[in-house]
Amino acid sequence: MLVRLLSIGDIGVLDGMMHIGDEAMFEALRDEMAMRDVGLVAVSSAPTESADRYGVPSVRNVGFRGLSRAAATERMRLVIDAAKRPSALETDDPAREVIDAVAGTDGVVVAGGGNLASRWSAHVFERATLAGIAGALGRPVVVTGQTLGPDLDPEDRAVLSPAFRAARLVGVRESASCALARELGVEARLGVDDASFLGDRDSDVDESGARRGVLVSLSLSLGDLRRPQAVARLARLIDEAAALTGEAVVFHAHFGPLDPGAPPRGDAILHDEVRERMSARSEVIPTGDPRAAARLARSSALLITGRYHPAVFAAPAGVPIVGLTSDDYTRIKQLGALAHWGQDGVAALGAADTDGTATLRRVWHDRAAISAAAEARMPANRAEASAWWDSVARG
């Protein structure tokens, strides 16, 4: 059993903005490792904030944002080389602290968050570099909770493949990611998202009450759809949901300000625009933290979401879900999250008020069967996830 791991996800609250999903995956990792007496050191965009939030030591990322591919490739080479020759880096280079942190731990975990696709190539370089540092220092690497691609160009595959092939374990969330991992030369474990059970066994959790409300969590990532068109279509879909279910509508931003009194930012901006176009009344719940977000999703009667982690939280509880997608990436993620629990209610954002309405009616009609399917799958999914965390802790 390992004693202390360094973990990189995509954490760190910057400018007062919380990203529920990314923080949730790290929080779940911290909880699972703590139950196995394994400590963590976090790699974060905001080390002081993350250290305070999670009660673990934190260091800053190596740093690849804004670099050209040539510059990123050279920086990766220099940093990995510096794992054995520290003098290769400037004295104030943040990579020095990362190298020291890896040297002071028993292994590295590449956690969920910062999905590995060419649209975010800085994440690819960051994680491949961390794996390279671990290899140079003789530390094992485990990869968990990943979505791969679907856009992963040959150059990024060449960066990522050696890191994946050197890892002792690789875990992904969707069958499409599993297939892409195989193309990279790795047989990956396919399982539920790492945050699927976040906080669901906390002592203050009470699931005895009836589920209430139409929960709406949208994303400002609209693909090729123009904003006014998206707002109009979403408003019609949500109005239909309110009329169909007879439930109150609640909006909850998964990317929004930590301060509940702050002006709307992130997803909350889109939420306000949609609310203005709706006929049904609605309320807003502040972004809050991952555990509160998970409880909210699990207690809802229906979820309409353009975000991924609301579905991750709600599906295990058997909440009927309408997942809205804007491209292949979001479609793969939504279908992947739902498939683990026997759901498939996904529609394109551009057809939210047509195909989305049909999906809404179907999942609401089938809500009893959806709940039963989740309940039937829970024991196996939970046991498999627990066994996976055991393997991660062993390295």
At which residue positions do the language-model features occur?
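Active-site anion-handling motifs in enzyme catalytic cores
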Residues: 1-395
